[in-house]
Structure formats: structure tokens, C-alpha cells
Amino acid sequence: MKFELDTTQGRARRGRLIFERGTVETPAFMPVGTYGTVKGMTPEEVRETGADILLGNTFHLWLRPGEEIMRKHGDLHDFMNWQRPILTDSGGFQVFSLGDIRKITEEGVHFRSPINGEKIFLDPEKSMQIQDSLGSDVVMIFDECTPYPATEDEARKSMQMSLRWAQRSRDEFDRLENPNSLFGIIQGGVYEDLRDESLNGLVDIGFDGYAVGGLAVGEPKEDMHRILEHVCPKIPADKPRYLMGVGKPEDLVEGVRRGVDMFDCVMPTRNARNGHLFTSEGVIKIRNARHRDDTSPLDDKCDCYTCKNYSRAYLYHLDRCNEILGARLNTIHNLRYYQRLMEGLRGAIETGTLDAFVTEFYTSQGREVPEVPELSD
């Protein structure tokens, strides 16, 4: 992977990630394909929304279908027929989400399969091996996602163990002679000094990119912004910056303003299936009865297949009847909305008009533009 940085405005960055399988324009949003599919979508449909790269889930793909079946197909690209870049998470967050059915030790994590209750062990080495079998273009280190809330001492112990796991991930990645890219994950909770210690340790080990983990796990939005403002300028400028698991459209806007290059989140797809649709004027809840006879498109500024061909009334009808097509059309729209937002942010950075773009983004939804500190590198 090669990262090119074209231009900046304040801390916002416009660039690209260049892989053998294709180029990813940044800032970028990655749709989530947990089980090797973006729910309800063919790879061609996902690509048509503007996506350059997908996220796959190491934990779930390890449990089903497993490494053996994956290798029989070649890798995850061949299995799901997506011949563009794929980033896979390490499984750490999913293990964190298991709660009481997992036990974390220095060696790794013991847990019971959420599928059949089988006892399973996952450690940094195994995570690297699984991601190698997936053929991931971007591999994430195995870490512990520090919970929120956590005391400073708890966050420190968690972060320091993640650093030790980062070294083990690096060593196993190199032993496997994996030709792809490995990203480190900065932990430390809401504590700036711990974030510094984590980042410095990761830079000493050396990675192809750096993710900010352990955010969007319940902390106040102000804390997320504060940590991003503190950490992003300290990440090596020639490496991509990835904010994991974020988020709402405004979170993407605010992340870009603070120097983030990459995002992922299930929100556009999950919300689509629940009838929450993103538009240039805010969220539309298609299940609201006022859409029953509305012949207008979801968003007259949107160029997606759904908006070009169907009315709000039709989408309301499909939802009321629990038709699969409704969830699919909603997903196409929400994913295209996210990609259009990223296209707009990239264009605004290129032309030096990011402030105007941000103002229009908020005012078109009847919202105030949030104040941010003067951000410059």
C-alpha cells in the first residue's frame, strides 16, 4: 500500500491509498460487510454507490465459514467476489462485545462461541493467521478495546497490554511474510497521556497506518473530539489515520475536520433496514404515516438508483409490507448518501472550501454549525 497526500485545509487531508487491487480516495468511508456481504447488496451494487473499499469481520468469518473454506476459494475477495481492497478488523472489538462469556489474559482471550457455545481461544498470532487467510489488503493488529467508563489505571493496563499484543501482531505478520499492510490501533481511553504512550509505542514498532480505537463506545461526543484533536496531529503525517466504528454523518464531517482519513460504521446499512434514511435535509423515518402518499423521492439532490426510480410512498409501502426490496432500496440510498458526503468533503478540501461545505451541511438540516478550536498542524 502507498499513501499519497495531495492537499490539506487546516487539519483536513485529501489523498489516496493505492493498492494492487485499486485506489481508495481519502477521506474514505468503508461499508461494513461483517459476514462477507454488505447486507442485502451484491458487490456490484455496493461499488455503484461509490465504495472503493469494504470492511470484513475477522471474528465472524473465522467462526463461519472458517479458514479452510476461505482458502479453498482463494481468499475473501474470491469468496465474496469483491476484487477491490478489503480491510479486516482483528476480532478484538467483537471479543470485547461478548461481555461475560469471555476472559482476557496476557496470552489472549478465552471465550465461548456465540454460535454453539464451543470453547475458543483467540490471540494476536491467531488473528494475524486468520487475516492472512482472508487476503486482507489492510490487516488490523489484535488489541483490547478499552471499555468506557474506565479509570485511568484500568485504561493504562489495557493500553499497555494492547501494546504488547501489537508487537506480537507485528512479529507474526512478518513471520507469515504477509505482503499486505498492517495498521496499529491507538488505545488509552479518554486520557490524553495514555493515548500519547500508546501512539509512541506503536510508532516505535512501526506500522503502515494508525487507527484510533476505543472511541464511540459510550463516551460523550466532546471527549471523542478532544482525543482526536490531541492525537491526530501526532500521528506521522505520511501514514493514513483511521477512526474505527464511526459513525453518524456529522461524526464523519467532524472527524475529517480533525484530520481523519478513513471511517467505517454499520449505521447506514443498519439504519436503512430500520427505515431511518439519511438525506441532505436530515433523517427521514420512512415508517412515518405522512410518507404514505408522498410521490417525491427521498432526496431530490441524490443520484442513487432509489431516488431516481422510486417515491417515498413506494418505500413506505414496501416497509409496511415487510418486502425485502424495501430494505435493499433503503440500503442503496443510505450507502450512496455516505459516499456522496465523502465526495463532497474531498472536493471541498481540494478547493479550499471546507468551511463553506460544513456550514451548508449543518444549515441545510436546520442545525447550528458546532464551534471547534482553531485547528492547524
Swiss-Prot record:
Per UniProt, what is the name of the gene that codes for the protein in this document? tgt
- The positions annotated for binding substrate are 89-93, 143, 187, 214
Q: Could you say which protein family the record assigns here?
A: Belongs to the queuine tRNA-ribosyltransferase family.
User: Which Pfam family, any one, appears in the UniProt record?
Assistant: TGT
EC number(s) recorded for this UniProt protein:
2.4.2.29
Name one process (GO BP) from the record. Answer: tRNA-guanine transglycosylation
* Gene3D superfamilies the record matches: Queuine tRNA-ribosyltransferase-like
Provide the binding site for Zn(2+): 302, 304, 307, 333
Q: Which residues form the signal peptide?
A: none
Q: What is the lineage of its organism?
A: Bacteria, Pseudomonadati, Pseudomonadota, Gammaproteobacteria, Alteromonadales
Q: Name one GO cellular component term.
A: cytosol
Q: Which function does this protein serve? A: Catalyzes the base-exchange of a guanine (G) residue with the queuine precursor 7-aminomethyl-7-deazaguanine (PreQ1) at position 34 (anticodon wobble position) in tRNAs with GU(N) anticodons (tRNA-Asp, -Asn, -His and -Tyr). Catalysis occurs through a double-displacement mechanism. The nucleophile active site attacks the C1' of nucleotide 34 to detach the guanine base from the RNA, forming a covalent enzyme-RNA intermediate. The proton acceptor active site deprotonates the incoming PreQ1, allowing a nucleophilic attack on the C1' of the ribose to form the product.
This protein's pathway reads: tRNA modification; tRNA-queuosine biosynthesis
Q: Name the source organism.
A: Shewanella pealeana (strain ATCC 700345 / ANG-SQ1)
Required co-factor? Zn(2+)
The record describes how the cofactor is bound as: Binds 1 zinc ion per subunit.
State the PANTHER family in the record.
Answer: QUEUINE TRNA-RIBOSYLTRANSFERASE (PTHR46499:SF1)
Catalytic activity of the protein: 7-aminomethyl-7-carbaguanine + guanosine(34) in tRNA = 7-aminomethyl-7-carbaguanosine(34) in tRNA + guanine
State the Gene Ontology terms under molecular function: metal ion binding; tRNA-guanosine(34) queuine transglycosylase activity
Its subunit composition reads: Homodimer. Within each dimer, one monomer is responsible for RNA recognition and catalysis, while the other monomer binds to the replacement base PreQ1.
Name of the protein this chain belongs to: Queuine tRNA-ribosyltransferase
What is its EC class? transferase
